Amino acid sequence: MNRRLPATLRELSECFRSKSLDPLTFTEHTLHRASDRAKHLNAFVRISSQTALQQAEASTQRHRSGSTLGPLDGATIAVKDNFCTRNVATTCASRMLESFVPTYSATVWERLERGGAVLVGKTNMDQFGMGSGTVDSIFGPTRNCWSESLEGERFRIAGGSSGGSAVAVASGVCFAALGSDTGGSTRNPASYCGVVGLKPTYGLLSRHGLIPLVNSMDVPGILTRTVKDCATVLNAIAGPDERDSTTVKKPFKPVELPESICLKGLRIGIPVEYHCEGLSEEVLHTWAKVADMLEDAGATVTSVSLPYTSASIFVYSILNQCEVSSNMSRYDGIEFGLRSDEDASTEQLYARSRAEGFNGVVKNRILTGNYFLLRKNYDKFFQKALQVRRLIAEDFDKAFTKVDFLLTPTTLSSAPLYEDFVQGTNRDQCAVQDFCTQPANMGGIPAISLPIRLSEHKLPISLQLMGPNFSEQNLLTVAKWIESQVEFEHLCATND
């Protein structure tokens, strides 16, 4: 395919409409592209060629007959490997689920599929979503496509735990990808890979078919190259789902982004607690520059305080590990998960199956969570963490009576080198990597990461915008304005 490739979903849809390109031809090219880059970047754990070609053929027929299903008909999309996809293996990048093939699809993928989307493949992740680098996977680490080198351990991490999805979009293989976000797992890799990453309001998107990590914080996330594409995907998958009691019952009103955006009267808050230890000068400079841009455009920019931010990472860690210990208990080798050959007794079968199926990170969180949930520790750890979580949510509620949105860093720096990243423990790295992102999960509020510029090492630097619950319409509108001003140049070429 020696032509200029579409850069956005709108361009792709226009190409299909004008018949200058058809979904089947485009999907064949995408699969070749995915396979070619898979060996270098390790973004995909499996490429679903047969499924994709069948879906693309059906889409091509619909386009020829003029009976398309919407703006995503024929669009190539990747799905993180913790979302169930019918008849396509779903492993959570763990040996525990290495042979699991779901008989049903997650609601969010089901809705994309009904809209004509094409499943390119399942993407790499940290095991069960427990990580911030996409380095703890049975399939090996994912390499950031912005890396100066892909040799040895000198590559840049992709972020996590949805690193494979972020790289699939950033490298130009897919137009969009599904990630999950428990404490920043969509926004963190979006920041490091220079793409848009949205964590919607808790309850706006169905969690049915998303293999749970922390039920009270997990949300499906969206990764795209543009804010408009993000809105298109959100419109396709948001809304009530009778199979998930935590989704809101009110019908979703689609996001419509205006062509002209005026910021006069808009109130932007800069949380002082996010100017924290470890924040790089480049990120700090970028943060200040975008705040100035917003002010110059007519917005009011003021400092605000979120007093419980410093406690948030500790509370998040406690609650995360408590829920992990509960959720992982289902994998016993009998009902779910890997079954060990050593079955002299039920106790031995349980022990060996879990020892062989889980990696050290998962085991550590299970043990720590069980410790916090012991009768003697329950009140002083779990109960107290729940109380402080409520105070964190109240911080946001109070702030949003004074400002409309909060502007913060997404990550404290650009993507670190893999060889440096793995020197720290998973727990220590998550404490650093999730500092700016996990408070939004604690409060259940929507947040979006936007690429702003490149660092001196030519790596993406991103910022985060947070808003009140169910403010996606206005949140994405402001995000689109910022995007239009910074004009971030994406890595993926549109010419092949």
Swiss-Prot record:
User: Which Pfam families does the record cross-reference, listed alphabetically?
Assistant: Amidase
Q: Which UniProt keywords apply?
A: ATP-binding, Ligase, Mitochondrion, Nucleotide-binding, Protein biosynthesis
List the active-site residues.
80, 161, 185
One Gene Ontology cellular component term attached to this UniProt record is:
glutamyl-tRNA(Gln) amidotransferase complex
Compartments annotated for it: namely: Mitochondrion
Reactions performed catalytically? L-glutamyl-tRNA(Gln) + L-glutamine + ATP + H2O = L-glutaminyl-tRNA(Gln) + L-glutamate + ADP + phosphate + H(+)
Which GO annotations describe the biological process of this protein?
A: glutaminyl-tRNAGln biosynthesis via transamidation; mitochondrial translation
Q: What is its EC number?
A: 6.3.5.7
Please list the GO terms describing molecular function: ATP binding; glutaminyl-tRNA synthase (glutamine-hydrolyzing) activity
The entry's family comment says:
Belongs to the amidase family. GatA subfamily.
- Say what the protein does: Allows the formation of correctly charged Gln-tRNA(Gln) through the transamidation of misacylated Glu-tRNA(Gln) in the mitochondria. The reaction takes place in the presence of glutamine and ATP through an activated gamma-phospho-Glu-tRNA(Gln).
Read off the PANTHER family from this record.
GLUTAMYL-TRNA(GLN) AMIDOTRANSFERASE SUBUNIT A, MITOCHONDRIAL, TRANSAMIDASE
Record's subunit section = Subunit of the heterotrimeric GatCAB amidotransferase (AdT) complex, composed of A, B and C subunits.
Q: What is this protein called?
A: Glutamyl-tRNA(Gln) amidotransferase subunit A, mitochondrial
Species whose genome carries this gene? Culex quinquefasciatus (Southern house mosquito)
